[in-house]
Amino acid sequence: MLFSPPLQRATLIQRYKRFLADVITPDGTTLTLHCPNTGAMTGCATPGDTVWYSTSENTKRKYPHTWELTETQFGAFICVNTLRANQLTKEAIQENRLPALAGYNILKSEVKYGAERSRIDFMLQADFRPDCYIEVKSVTLAEKENGYFPDAITERGQKHLRELMGVAAAGHRAVVVFAVLHSAITRFSPARHIDIKYAQLLSEAQNKGVEVLAYKAELSAQKMELNEPVPITL
């Protein structure tokens, strides 16, 4: 995924009201950015960090600038735009960069499924193969080189795991992909210290046939690409 037009650089003043952030540009202008992340963003929004933002061509938007990346004062890149996790995963599947998800010729997005009336991020289909249901989660919480999900209690995430267990029980492939969007992370675990229920459900889901995968994105202010498998400890 190439950023076109190129991202612009600023320095973070503060994030507030969950969806907004104030930054100061190199010429001293203060801007308010849209923050497309509802999570805690722990370690991703420290005042003084470098922010890379995109600008929409839609002149009717109240906040035309969107916070895409954080470049921390320690040199790590973090993609804070949670929408990018799905885009990067879709791109990687279509370009056959994820061997575990190769061999399908049809990819559908936002398909309704499950007893709790959810929408799956992606469904893959091919002749003579079971349908493959994929739920994608964005991983940005880091402690040293360890990556964790979630960064706050997520009842929605718990629901998705229950739905995936139902998919597996029905004879389909069920997959959860953790898209690691933090350059300092080298391994992944569920955040038991934050959401013990989610961690327990993830282990249960794996035991019941749900595949658990984690891939790391190569991040820069110019492009992003999801391709590197990350070790998982449940």
UniProtKB/Swiss-Prot annotation:
The highest taxon in the source lineage is Bacteria
**Gene that codes for this?**
sfsA
Entry annotated with the keyword Ubl conjugation: no
Give the CDD domains listed for this entry. SfsA-like_bacterial (cd22359)
Tell me the Gene3D superfamilies matching this sequence.
2.40.50.580, 3.40.1350.60
**Annotated organism of origin:** Salmonella paratyphi A (strain AKU_12601)
Give the protein name, as stated in the record: Sugar fermentation stimulation protein A
> InterPro entries of this UniProt entry?
SfsA (IPR005224), SfsA_C (IPR040452), SfsA_N (IPR041465)
Q: Which UniProt keywords apply?
A: DNA-binding
